Amino acid sequence: HFSALNDTLTNRQTCIIESMCKMYSYTGDKEILQKAGHIWDLFSMNGGTKDNEVFIHGDMVSSKPIDVHGVTAAEVSKQPLILYLYTGRQEYLDAALGFYSSVERENELPDGIPASYESLFPKHAEALHETCDISDFIWSYGYMLMATGDVKWADKMESAVYNAALGAINKDFKALQYFSSPNQLLATEKSSMAPYGEEGLSRQAYRPGFDVECCSGNVHRMFPNYISRMWMNGDEHEIVAALYGPSEYRTEINGTKVCITEDTSYPFSGKITFRFALDGAPVRIPFTMRIPSWVENAKLTVNAEQPKEYHAGGFSTIERRFKDGDVVELDIDMKPRAEKRTDAGINVYMGPLLYSVDIDENVEIIKDQFKTSVAFPAYNVTPASKWNFGLPENPEITVVNTGKKGFPWT
């Protein structure tokens, strides 16, 4: 199949490169990898092809502003990243770094996903993003993390999942928004700020389906793309805790089965406990944990020994002979922070979470419209309390811990 492909592909057709590289990893067939690189080189290098929308190599490297469908931006731009992982060619990584620098500078909203009214759009206070883009940029950020080892991409993945992704779906996963916004006041069948005709007016409401079905078919990728990067591997049996959340990791090292259980209420708490269970003799493991870039300081303790302090924005490694029953505790300092944005907004964060005003809601349940049913209804949501508040540039923020535990999204 791959050998029969045309060498000249256009835009999202080049996404087959990801599958070609994966097949190479299974087979070791160098011709597949060479053809994948050749397809991208023809498409992007030396001026690219005439059908290339925004992926000319020189434009990507120079971080030129981008005007293209958001999904196309996320899915095509990760192809040089994947090629870099398999070939080590620096020019592939340079193209992706320049491209995502432009997305961050021109388009990225407070929840980690770029503004996209189908096409990428300049960021502003009321800007929207398509739910497809949430899934796809999380996917691409995962490859950026693999390629660069830079914690900023893990930070973006957490921001996108814990804010944009979970804000765009209902708790029961039966309804979603086509367009969502960090600064949204209405979610009704007539409220979309990017209407795309009469049928498109409902795209900011929570519904099981829309006039087009791309987001309903793509939303399932959000969490697998996150979970598949929570635990990663390095060289020499290195185990990397890259993204945080309750989880379990199992592997085998030199004949010893190792299970690491991560206990945490992150992102609501910075206390993360890793419990090691081994079924045999102690084994030497480089165990690496991410220290997010928003942290002022973090403390790391092994078996309740004297803690060590770490600073923000890197990966910290403990290399030791781990034995059954060992406990590693990471305490990430979560302090509220107010960040002023270039679009005149002020965002309030604590840890990876973007905070908002708690607004009372009026909820109308719709069961008799096209693509709705009793089992899968749609919802019109409007505010039932005041929402029009402003913040000073340097607000004083007090954290009140109510003692609640668990995850409010489920």
What are the residue ranges of the model-derived segments?
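Solenoidal tandem-repeat scaffolds enriched in leucines and small polar residues
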Residues: 5-52, 60-63
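Carbohydrate-binding surfaces of carbohydrate-active enzymes
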Residues: 145, 150-154, 279, 292, ...
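C-terminal beta-rich recognition modules with glycine/proline-rich loops and embedded aromatic residues
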Residues: 36, 96, 155-163, 168-278, ...
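Well-ordered alpha-helical segments within folded domains of soluble proteins
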Residues: 8-25, 68-85, 129-145, 215-226
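Structural helix-adjacent loops and short alpha-helical linkers that scaffold large soluble proteins
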Residues: 1, 23-37, 84-97, 104, ...
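Short beta-strand segments within Ig-like beta-sandwich modules, predominantly Fibronectin type-III
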Residues: 306-312
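Long, well-ordered core segments of solenoidal/helical folds
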Residues: 1-2, 34-53, 95-112, 159-170
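Beta-strand-rich binding/interaction modules
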Residues: 282-302
